[in-house]
Amino acid sequence: MNHQQKKEQHSGVRDQEIRAALDQHWAASDANDFETEHLIYHEDAVLEYPQSGERTRGRCNIQNQRASQPSKKRFAVRRIIGSGDLWVTEFILKYDGRPSYTVSIMEFKGDKVARETQYFADPFVAPAWRAQ
């Protein structure tokens, strides 16, 4: 096996490990298991919500911010794609029973998330001009 093949094999194993960690993260998120949900983050991770301008620094602060939300959340993962250090999850977040279509972009450093950016969109009725 040459150097390139070894590198690709290692990359494939790492991708499988990250995917398993993501599956565990989203399952814990859906169960409102805040301890397990936040194991995926580096201690100095950054979480950004560009739509509101919020930026939370540090795994403990991210966990505390999410744990302080007054209602339980539900997560329905629709798709996870990625490789290497960049992974994207598309999911439906239900908060107080209202769905929000959400995209999470996670940037990994090693086996932990260093930065996550999330975008949220409420459902809407398609305009008549697009109904063809």
Residue ranges and their predicted role:
Residues 28, 35-36, 52, 96, ...:
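Hydrophobic alpha-helical elements and their junctions with loops/disorder across both membrane
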Residues 15, 34-84:
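A solvent-exposed, acidic/Ser-Thr-rich amphipathic alpha-helical stretch
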Residues 25, 47-48, 90:
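Alpha-helix C-capping/helix-to-loop hinge sites
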Residues 2-13, 63-132:
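A beta-strand edge to alpha-helix "cap/lid" segment located at domain peripheries
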